[in-house]
């Protein structure tokens, strides 16, 4: 059997030794024996795609390299379920911008990964297709909403994957599964072809077993797209930033990210990581970001409000699941009642309430004002330091079913990740240790479009530690 957990460079070497078709077949064999329910759909065209790469001698940067795609990103010929019954049977007739870029680079799409329904969640438990298990402990969640993408990378079922991050949906599962996950600056990667949850917050982001593969993927998918009015051509060269050197780098540690309820093992691992940076020549100072305390409430009001608007389009009329009804109104009502899961309905209702005439100013408008204050906190802190560092998640992965019946507790999981989405800045989660045998993630945040500094710090940490080389015993 093919070796699991290969880097992109190792995959490319393996392709030279054998073929893209053989490498793809190896991953498909691993997926077939999976214990984690990481994929919703495995592509029946992956081998054909890989064989075509071999025959045509594609010379793109990802020629023949397999990749997994979160199932809210449109791929021609593959279902795009968003983990929801309401999109059952829907196959998009177009590719997302990031998929176009990947195919141009020669990547082979293995399949579509599991997620919280419409990317609304932090545990990948709300999927219509069942929960995904964490490869480190099959009774625990992988995080969410891109839990399938993180889990398949951690389990060796793909060398890397794409996810989307609205309030931590790439970084949370990266931390829980012990992989690297980047939320790029808002606008760095086109959202065209990504089914919208909260447009003003979300970004497509990569997950991989090492920082170098994150940079390789960003060099492919980032850049301007005229079909996404929020995309920006920053002309960033991500791989060139990967230098093993943090001497003189100023690190800010925001005390608000180490608040009440943080797991002692997580806190210890993160502080050990920060001290490691100091030993490598970086300097540290405490910073205060007082409005972070209001970020979670602001985030959920904004996200749910945008979701209630975005999800109005799913009614069974043109595509996806359709319930029977005696007239059009009855059909739409029944379709949405049966097609959406409990958590999605909850967020639609709360978002509609926040946008209603009597409460718009009290909730939605106030949340937007708080968002501005949070952004100002980041601007102020990052004017005095190069990077901010904190725990990605306040706790390690929790058990499947432990929090799903308590939405508020589940929402609180996003306390350290959602402020970054409100501010629109880049943030990467890297493995920095373990507690109770479960991975811990260090979150490194930077100035807008300063992914090079963020990735340089992450790369240096990786080069001087071995946490990213650890593999889950459950699937080894």
From Swiss-Prot:
Ranges annotated as spanning the membrane: none
UniProt-listed Enzyme Commission number(s): 6.3.5.7
Residue positions of the active site: 70 (charge relay system), 145 (charge relay system), 169 (acyl-ester intermediate)
GO cellular component terms given for this protein: glutamyl-tRNA(Gln) amidotransferase complex
GO molecular function: ATP binding; glutaminyl-tRNA synthase (glutamine-hydrolyzing) activity
Gene Ontology BP terms: translation
Reaction catalysis annotation: L-glutamyl-tRNA(Gln) + L-glutamine + ATP + H2O = L-glutaminyl-tRNA(Gln) + L-glutamate + ADP + phosphate + H(+)
PROSITE patterns: AMIDASES (PS00571)
Keywords assigned: ATP-binding, Ligase, Nucleotide-binding, Protein biosynthesis
Cross-referenced Pfam families: Amidase (PF01425)
Family label: Belongs to the amidase family. GatA subfamily.
HAMAP family reported for this sequence: GatA (MF_00120)
Function: Allows the formation of correctly charged Gln-tRNA(Gln) through the transamidation of misacylated Glu-tRNA(Gln) in organisms which lack glutaminyl-tRNA synthetase. The reaction takes place in the presence of glutamine and ATP through an activated gamma-phospho-Glu-tRNA(Gln).
Subunit structure, interactors included: Heterotrimer of A, B and C subunits.
Protein name, as recorded: Glutamyl-tRNA(Gln) amidotransferase subunit A
Species assigned in the record: Methanosarcina acetivorans (strain ATCC 35395 / DSM 2834 / JCM 12185 / C2A)
Phylogenetic placement of the source organism: Archaea, Methanobacteriati, Methanobacteriota, Stenosarchaea group, Methanomicrobia
Gene responsible for this protein: gatA
């Amino acid at each position: 059997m093919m070796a699991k957990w290969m880097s992109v460079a190792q995959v490319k070497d393996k392709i030279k030794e054998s073929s893209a078709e053989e490498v793809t077949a190896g991953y498909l064999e691993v997926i077939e024996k999976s214990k984690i329910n990481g994929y919703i759909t495995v592509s029946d065209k992956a081998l054909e795609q890989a064989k075509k790469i071999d025959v045509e001698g594609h010379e793109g940067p990802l020629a023949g390299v397999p990749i997994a795609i979160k199932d809210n990103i449109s791929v021609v010929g593959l279902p795009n379920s968003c983990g929801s019954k309401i999109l059952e049977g829907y196959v998009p007739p177009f590719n997302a911008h990031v998929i176009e870029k990947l195919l141009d680079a020669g990547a082979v799409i293995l399949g579509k990964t599991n997620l919280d329904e419409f990317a609304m969640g932090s545990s990948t438990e709300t999927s219509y297709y069942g929960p995904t298990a964490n490869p480190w402990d099959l009774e625990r969640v992988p995080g969410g909403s891109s839990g399938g993408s993180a889990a398949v990378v951690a389990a060796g079922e793909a060398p890397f994957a794409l996810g989307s991050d609205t309030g931590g949906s790439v970084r949370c599962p990266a931390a829980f599964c012990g992989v690297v996950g980047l939320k790029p600056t808002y606008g760095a990667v086109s959202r065209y072809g990504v089914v919208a949850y909260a447009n003003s917050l979300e970004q497509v982001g990569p997950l991989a077993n090492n920082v170098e593969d994150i940079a390789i993927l960003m060099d492919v998918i980032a850049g301007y797209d005229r079909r996404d009015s929020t995309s920006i051509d920053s002309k960033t060269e991500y791989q060139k930033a990967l230098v093993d050197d943090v001497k003189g780098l100023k690190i800010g540690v925001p005390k608000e990210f180490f608040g009440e309820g943080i797991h002692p093992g997580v806190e210890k691992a993160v502080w050990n990581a920060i001290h490691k940076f100091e030993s490598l020549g970086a300097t540290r100072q405490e910073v205060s970001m007082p409005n972070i305390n209001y970020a979670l409430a602001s985030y959920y009001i904004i996200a749910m409000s945008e979701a209630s608007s975005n999800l109005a389009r799913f009614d069974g009329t043109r595509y996806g699941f359709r319930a029977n009804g005696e007239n059009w109104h009855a059909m739409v009502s029944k379709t949405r009642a049966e097609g959406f899961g409990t958590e999605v309905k909850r967020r639609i209702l709360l978002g509609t309430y926040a946008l209603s005439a009597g409460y718009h100013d009290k909730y939605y408008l106030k949340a937007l004002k708080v968002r501005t204050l949070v952004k100002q906190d980041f601007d102020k802190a990052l004017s005095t330091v190069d990077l901010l560092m904190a725990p990605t998640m306040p706790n390690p992965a929790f058990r499947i079913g432990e929090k799903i019946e308590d939405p508020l507790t589940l929402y609180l999981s996003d306390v350290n990740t959602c402020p970054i989405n409100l501010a629109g800045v880049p943030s990467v989660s890297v493995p920095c240790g373990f507690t109770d045998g479960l991975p811990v993630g260090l979150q490194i945040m930077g100035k807008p479009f300063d992914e090079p500094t963020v990735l340089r710090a992450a790369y240096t940490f990786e080069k001087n530690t071995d946490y990213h080389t650890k593999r889950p015993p459950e699937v080894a």
